[in-house]
Amino acid sequence: MAFLARCFGCQACRSVALLSGRYLQSRVWMGLPDSWPLLSLQQARGRARGNEYQPSNIKRKHKHGWVRRLSTPAGVQVILRRMLKGRKSLSH
């Protein structure tokens, strides 16, 4: 914009200055390419992780309990295998 001071009344120089200013403003408005990775880092930082396991005693007893183990042949095999190994707790 320093050349505007030299040719103050020239219409061509004034239009070039206005166009170049608008071009710069539009590039700043769209965002520079080197600022894009920062946006992706910010989005990934806010995600909560590690809270998938929410224990429930009822579900644990229904899936791995004594009644469920004895209700299927594979469950009986699990109980016998644990007895053979010497486990104190055979099921939940």
Swiss-Prot record:
Residues found modified as Phosphoserine: S71
UniProt keyword Ribonucleoprotein, yes or no: yes
Cysteine disulfide partners in this protein: none
Quaternary structure and partners: Component of the mitochondrial ribosome large subunit (39S) which comprises a 16S rRNA and about 50 distinct proteins.
Name assigned to this protein: Large ribosomal subunit protein bL34m
Entry keyword set: Mitochondrion, Phosphoprotein, Ribonucleoprotein, Ribosomal protein, Transit peptide
BP GO annotations: mitochondrial translation; translation
Xref: Gene3D superfamilies: 1.10.287.3980
Pfam families named among the record's database cross-references: Ribosomal_L34
Gene Ontology annotations for the cellular component aspect, listed alphabetically: mitochondrial inner membrane; mitochondrial large ribosomal subunit; mitochondrion
Family, as annotated: Belongs to the bacterial ribosomal protein bL34 family.
Species this chain originates from: Mus musculus
Keyword Phosphoprotein among UniProt keywords: yes
Coiled-coil region list: none
Subcellular location: Mitochondrion
GO MF term list: structural constituent of ribosome
Chief location bin: mitochondrion
Residue range covered by the transit peptide: 1-46
